[in-house]
Amino acid sequence: MINPIVKTIELPDGRTITLETGKLAKQADGSVMLRMGNTMLLATVCAAKDAVPGTDFMPLQVEYKEKYSAFGRFPGGFTKREGKASDYEILTCRLVDRALRPLFPDNFHAEVYVNIVLFSADGIDMPDALAGLAASAALAVSDIPFGGPISEVRVARIDGQFVINPTFEQLEKADMDLMVAATYDNIMMVEGEMQEVSEQDLLAAMKAAHEAIKVHCKAQMELMEEVGSTVKREYCHEENDEDLRKAVREACYDKAYAIAASGNRNKHERQDAFDAIRDEFKTQYTEEELEEKGALIDRYYHDVEKEAMRRCILDEGKRLDGRKTTEIRPIWCEVGYLPGPHGSAIFTRGETQSLTSVTLGTKLDEKIVDDVLDQHRERFLLHYNFPPYSTGEAKAQRGVGRREIGHGHLAWRALKGQIPAGYPYTVRVVSDIMESNGSSSMATVCAGTLALMDAGVAMKKPVSGIAMGLIKNAGEEKYAVLSDILGDEDHLGDMDFKVTGTRDGITATQMDIKVDGLSFEILEKALLQAKEGREHILNKLTECIAEPRKDLKPHAPRIETMTIPKEFIGAIIGPGGKIIQGMQEETGATITIEETDGVGRIEIAGTNKKCIDDAMRIIKGIVAVPEVGEVYVGKVRSVMPYGVFVEFLPGKDGLLHISEIDWKRLETIEEAGLKEGDEIEVKLLDIDPKTGKFKLSHKVLLPRPEKQEKK
């Protein structure tokens, strides 16, 4: 007999979330089925009993998968089964991973796998906002050491009011879309996009989300009590030698502090200097001793290096590269560097550099999104590439990783709101990171702004981005907020807070916090300091290019749009696409047509004005209504014994009878001298009311000969 344990969370708006354990996947270390409405997510967690020898990090793997059957759909493709993870699934994985990872004990190194699967969906509630809660609940009912519980919610602002976990329909009306993850006491992760909101609005949204999360966390703690999983497993994944730890600190700390305070701006030289201190310490040991103690020395020295860097900032206000806490690295920009793309830019900030290109395309270039719960076409794309050479690493370049998808998505959210809604082009921005020493995603935002303006894209406003950091020791009042952080400051610091925006407000943000007890006062200081940094960077961008170019590059496609009555869509496409394909072959233009808002919307793209004008002329001819008495220049399409058929408007043929070719009597059609392809001026005499056939005449346009008198 199965006796599952169920915990119900009552939400302020009347909706409920249930957490059920003990019914499914009982061999996993922890499993929970979360249900909200008809949306159901199963989260399972499994951890190895021991760590792989030599592992000194947290080998956590989070997977999120949506079943097409959850929404009563078949997957696409020939195999008709789910394939590799979509971008949306990868982004959801990252949201959960970033919320969970900081809460595992520092000395816990066993492999942990968290799997979240969407088994049912109703198209109303958004499952990505529930995945974090499901994963945390699975960890809560397991014996895996974890410093949670946490929960994750989406907060949207709709008509000035904050809504927690809005529906798909509600989110479309929001001017703020923010995902927040937190424990009962502390915010851990924030990510979202917004329509140029203030720093105070962002903080208010985070506070509203945290209040909702507290309810979720309390329910999980009660679930742990009911399940009996409050006591976690014992483990020993690190061996320590306190005498060796003390020896490393005494021998190396002062030297490491001196390097941290030296202000060397070259990260490789600085790292070599740090490494030399450790290597010098190791010289006192034999090879046999280093085989036993080498890994411990490396770990203890890493702690020394971290402490030296942090104390130097807190005590002297001096950063690794010599900057003050609010100082931005030197910036230089260039636009139009690449002649081939339709727009390009280089943005360099210190040792971080992005080379970004822009390509303009037509509707045919749109990205087709076919996720389980979301099907649409995307006209603004941004791709981020992080090759190994950007950090001087000697390794092969593999496919696109989760990090690249996540960084690209953040930059995409930062910029997309500044592309006008009716902009006719499909736009692809590609950022290739040439050098990296911190905040390469923010360099992508800045380079993307420059490249878009260089391409002549009608951006509403330029956008800049900055990454903020924090140094704060537990139990110590003193702290330092850092502007424009280095890679080492991200790694050794307590916060990575990325903020993008225009002069009028924030457009996107991403925050990861590794420290407990971070107050909203500190977050507000970080946001206001970020605003100053963003404005400084914006000034540098607009010095390089003040506004979008007035015209596109000569080799960029030109697009014209026109609307037609929807009943003419079929006439323009033709049977099997014959007419539209023929127009494209004849003119060299690319033509797309679709029905929107009760009319046919046509986009005509070409590399020059002539091909677009030619296509528009043909289309106007097709949709033109033939009028009796009008004169047209037509083309002979076929020759018959009794006359010729003339196409006097695109797709409209009429009979020019042999008797209507000339005033004089013609015995045979050959006497007229007409052949296929000849142009001839005709007048529309009549339209048969029953058949719709057109009767044409050429002779009425000729002078009528005078009648000769009979002798």
Curated annotation (Swiss-Prot):
Residue span, KH domain: 557-619
Location of the S1 motif domain: 629-699
Domain of life: Bacteria
Sites where the protein binds Mg(2+): 490, 496
GO cellular component: cytosol
Example GO BP: RNA processing
First-listed, main subcellular location of the protein, grouped into a coarse class: cytoplasm
Keyword set includes Hydrolase: no
Alphabetic keyword roster: Cytoplasm, Magnesium, Metal-binding, Nucleotidyltransferase, RNA-binding, Transferase
Leading EC class: transferase
Compartment(s) where it occurs, according to its Swiss-Prot or TrEMBL record: Cytoplasm
Disulfide bonds: none
Record-given protein name: Polyribonucleotide nucleotidyltransferase
Species of provenance: Phocaeicola vulgatus (strain ATCC 8482 / DSM 1447 / JCM 5826 / CCUG 4940 / NBRC 14291 / NCTC 11154)
Name of the gene: pnp
